[in-house]
């Protein structure tokens, strides 16, 4: 499996501190992979929340594809972690892989419908809306994307006399 987000955050802090100490301007370029063996919708939703909270907006996300000779490939084909012999969930359906990928790019309006579907399936309807923790806006009643007009925003409506 992959390390959790806390490990990445610790690495990022150490990386930044070392570069500041050395007077270097180097940046981390993260590589995101969706549908990795062991990743359920729950984990993909948690990663989307982490990305939201850390202002991470990946332009490119790669779906997991088995590569010969790797532990992840063994998990993909067998459904077991070869080191622990514990069963591992492996997302294989086109629909779930698409939802996991969309979650990592939840800010892209083209992904909103799939993200809403994933959030509902994952029991996280609380992340649909307009609040600070929402990942996507609700669907409009006609199924089309809603665009906020100035009058839709608080304090921007028609003046009352």
Where in this protein do the model-derived segments appear?
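Flexible loop/turn segments at secondary-structure boundaries
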Residues: 35-41, 67-73, 136-137
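Conserved AdoMet/S-adenosylmethionine-binding subsite of the radical SAM
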Residues: 1-63
């Amino acid at each position: 499996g992959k390390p959790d987000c806390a490990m990445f955050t610790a690495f990022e802090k150490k990386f930044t501190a070392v570069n500041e100490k050395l007077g270097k301007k180097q940046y981390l370029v993260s590589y995101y992979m969706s549908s990795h063996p062991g990743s359920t919708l729950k984990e993909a939703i948690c990663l989307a929340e982490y990305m939201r909270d850390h202002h991470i907006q990946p332009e490119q996300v790669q779906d997991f594809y088995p590569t010969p000779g790797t532990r992840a490939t063994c998990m993909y084909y067998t459904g077991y972690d070869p080191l622990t012999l514990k069963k591992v969930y492996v997302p294989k359906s086109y629909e779930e892989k698409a939802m996991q990928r969309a979650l990592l790019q939840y800010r892209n309006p083209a992904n909103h419908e799939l993200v809403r579907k994933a959030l509902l399936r994952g029991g996280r309807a609380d992340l649909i809306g307009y609040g600070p923790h929402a990942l996507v806006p609700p669907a409009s009643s006609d199924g089309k994307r809603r665009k906020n007009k100035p009058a839709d925003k608080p304090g921007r409506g028609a003046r009352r006399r």
